[in-house]
């Protein structure tokens, strides 16, 4: 499908249907609007490339999910509000901020694989060599290039793939947790999770459900982190449920 530009050319994406969008889909880190092609077919919907991904230009400054939500918010002005926000992973971080910032415009959320909270049991400490490198850098013993080399070696796949301002944004975002936003959301939320999600384990979804005023958690057996592409019809079922509640 053809790409269209939005928000004065700062965002690009694909529209589904001919009427104003009632569903807005926000993809994960390193992904694109294409992830939602199967789950949005036949709807009046919009799937965008978030700033810095696909063909949408990167932001001009470093910030977290709240900043990204403000960059995406103009999309709501062309929609048939209240909309259903669909957020996968990084896109879900934005969705909870949008629900807090523009509550009247959001009629429901469908979230999948979103690191909404820090893990109950944090992963192991960084490699000893990397920890030592950070300490030496802080003392001025090694330069920025040396530390960057260690980050490239020991950082996550997303970190290694990012560069420039997008890498700084990633570092900001992965340290965020959204207890405040979850408690403030009044719109109903469907949490659709793969039981094999190791990027945002199901225990995060269960704890998030307890913080939300109106939430439903569905676990998908044998499904990984990438629900939009590995289980698009399960995602569509949740979208249809939220749309039905708006009618």
Stretches found by the model and what they are:
Residues 12-55:
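Conserved HGGG/HGGXW glycine-rich cap/lid loop of the alpha/beta-hydrolase fold
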Residues 47-86, 237:
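Active-site loop/oxyanion-hole signature of alpha/beta-hydrolase fold enzymes
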Residues 87-91, 95:
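Gly/Ala-rich beta-loop-alpha elbow adjacent to hydrolase catalytic centers
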Residues 96-100, 105-139:
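Flexible "cap/lid" loop of the alpha/beta hydrolase fold
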Residues 152-180:
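Hydrophobic, aromatic-rich cap/lid helix
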Residues 184-185, 191-193:
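Short beta-strand/loop motif that positions the catalytic acidic residue
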Residues 196-200, 225:
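Acidic catalytic loop of the alpha/beta-hydrolase fold
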Residues 223-236:
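Catalytic histidine-centered segment of alpha/beta-hydrolase-like enzymes
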């Amino acid at each position: 499908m053809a790409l269209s530009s939005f928000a004065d050319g700062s965002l690009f994406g694909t529209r589904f249907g001919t009427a104003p969008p009632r569903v807005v889909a926000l993809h994960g880190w390193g992904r694109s609007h294409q992830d939602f092609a199967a789950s949005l077919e036949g709807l009046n919907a919009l799937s965008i490339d978030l700033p810095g991904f696909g063909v949408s230009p990167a932001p001009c400054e470093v910030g977290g999910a709240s900043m990204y939500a403000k960059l995406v918010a103009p999309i709501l002005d062309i929609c048939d509000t209240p909309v259903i926000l669909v957020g996968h992973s990084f896109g879900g971080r934005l969705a909870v901020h949008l629900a807090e910032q523009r509550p009247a415009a959001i009629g429901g959320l469908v979230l999948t694989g979103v690191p909404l909270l820090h893990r109950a049991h944090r992963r192991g400490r960084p490699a000893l060599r990397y920890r030592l490198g950070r300490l030496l850098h802080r003392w001025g013993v090694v330069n920025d290039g040396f530390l960057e080399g260690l980050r490239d070696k020991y950082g996550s796949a997303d970190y290694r793939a990012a560069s420039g301002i997008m890498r700084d944004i990633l570092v900001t975002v992965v340290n965020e947790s959204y207890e405040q936003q979850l408690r403030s959301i009044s719109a109903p939320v469907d949490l659709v999770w793969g039981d094999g999600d190791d990027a945002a384990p199901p225990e995060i979804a269960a704890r998030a459900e307890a913080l939300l005023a109106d939430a439903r958690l569905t676990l998908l057996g044998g499904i990984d982190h990438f629900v939009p592409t590995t289980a698009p019809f399960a995602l569509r079922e949740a979208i249809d449920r939220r749309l039905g509640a708006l009618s």
